[in-house]
Amino acid sequence: EYIVLDDGWMAKERDKNGNLVADSIKFPSGMKALADYIHAKGLKFGIYNCAGSKTCAGYPGSRGYEYQDARSYASWDVDYLKYDWCNTEKLNAEGAYITMRDALKAAGRPIVFSICEWGDNQPWKWAKDVGHAWRVTGDIINCWDCEVGHGSWSSWGIWKIINMRKNIRKVAGPGH
């Protein structure tokens, strides 16, 4: 039902007014045209950004631009936001996600808010009141029971994830 663009859809810098802009080579018609195309196919359009100053791949993050970015997403008719946790400079996770939640609400368009915090700050204790969906680990990797380090972060196999997070099943439910 959703087509979600992950990290790297935007230009390396914001425009002169501080707005996010699409990478003009990857998306020459921009995000609104892409959203219109996806919606015309009967699908919903999702986009990625990050609570930090930069995304995981080094593109502009939303820190300090939450309300401006939320207005952009609404003007592009975005239906879903995956909001990652890279380059967060010791931000308070719950507070950072509340700020974007409030910005999305203020933008006036219903946007599913997916909290991609990796479980480091125990989102199972607060995320259900902040977003529509939340993760509890880092990235899933194509293996059954393994962990692969990537420097400052790791990926896990599904069995390892199940065993790591089995004690939080009581807080799981539809949308979480």
Q: What is each model feature region?
A:
Residues 1-90:
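Aromatic-lined carbohydrate-binding/catalytic grooves of carbohydrate-active enzymes
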Residues 29-33, 68, 91-95, 99, ...:
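Generic recognition of stable, solvent-exposed alpha-helical segments in well-folded globular domains
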Residues 17, 29, 45, 107, ...:
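Feature targets compositionally biased, intrinsically disordered low-complexity regions
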